Regions:
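Bacterial Sec-dependent N-terminal signal peptides
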Residues: 1-11
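Alpha-carbonic anhydrase
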Residues: 2-4, 24-261
């Protein structure tokens, strides 16, 4: 089942801001003197998001908020996600909340016969999701949105290990200036290189993990991908903690796939 992003809260332009640029409408307006800023600590931190702006209300009142601690998952007859990630020039921005890579149109996933184009991916340190109470060193979120406004997020847990070549390239091109998008046309990447070989997953109904915390369908890959301790440290120097705290499950069903390829 796909969960429709709350269009009552988000105009098409605002949805594009959240999913494509990795910022909220309020954050965009803040730069024009509008709605309040949010952060990961202090008076505008996660425990206060729902009170910062009426459009953030779901952060406080939503019953299917993310991230969650994934446990007691039910085995289910689920099909593999069909990934069709292609090459893209690197477009990267340090938006003040994370490092975000915007993706060239033409890449997508297919879930239950429906196509969801990939619009961006970004990183959190430590992981926002937990598996049986355990966090990973980091997590990568791929954000997809269909033509009719349904959103799917795919989380790939990142653990300390060998150096990751694609992350090395991304880190080497992080802009020094916040909120300045930089395109490196001669640097071509493929997001498929950040996927685990085993693509079994957990899936559940959830939300964006940043304001306005609107509904999103989540797929969390069961197998992590490695990056080096130095690569983790480099990101942590920029963002020591850009992870929303764990949210209540509120009786949500969590399913897990167990297919063999």
């Amino acid at each position: 089942m796909k969960i429709r992003v709350a269009v009552s809260q988000l105009s098409l332009a605002a949805l594009s801001a959240v999913l494509f640029f990795g910022i909220t409408p309020a954050f965009a307006q803040q730069h024009a003197g509008g709605a309040p800023h949010w952060s990961y600590s202090g008076p505008d931190g996660p425990e206060h998001w729902g009170d910062l702006d009426p459009s953030y209300a779901s952060c406080k009142t939503g019953q299917r908020q993310s991230p969650i601690d994934i446990k007691d998952a039910e085995p289910a007859d689920l099909k593999p996600i069909q990934f069709d990630y292609k090459l893209s020039p690197m477009k990267i921005v340090n938006n003040g909340h994370t490092i975000l890579v915007k993706y060239e149109p033409g890449s997508s996933i297919t879930v239950d016969g429906k196509q969801y184009p990939l619009v961006q991916f970004h990183f959190h340190h430590p992981s926002e999701e937990e598996i049986n109470g355990q966090k990973s060193d980091m997590v990568l979120h791929f954000v997809h949105v269909s033509a009719d406004g349904h959103a799917i997020a795919i989380a790939v847990l990142l653990k300390s290990g060998g150096e990751n070549p694609l992350i090395r390239d991304i880190w080497a091109h992080i802009p020094k200036e916040v909120d300045k998008e930089v395109e490196f046309k001669k640097v071509v990447i493929n997001a498929a290189d950040l996927l685990p070989a085993d693509q079994n997953y957990y899936t559940f109904d959830g939300s964006l993990t940043i304001p306005p915390c609107s509904d999103v369908k989540w797929f969390v890959m069961k197998t992590p991908v490695e990056l080096s301790p130095a690569q983790i440290a480099a990101f942590a120097k920029l963002y020591p903690d850009n992870a929303r705290p764990i949210q209540a499950t509120n009786g949500r069903k969590i399913q897990e796939s167990n297919f063999t390829e």
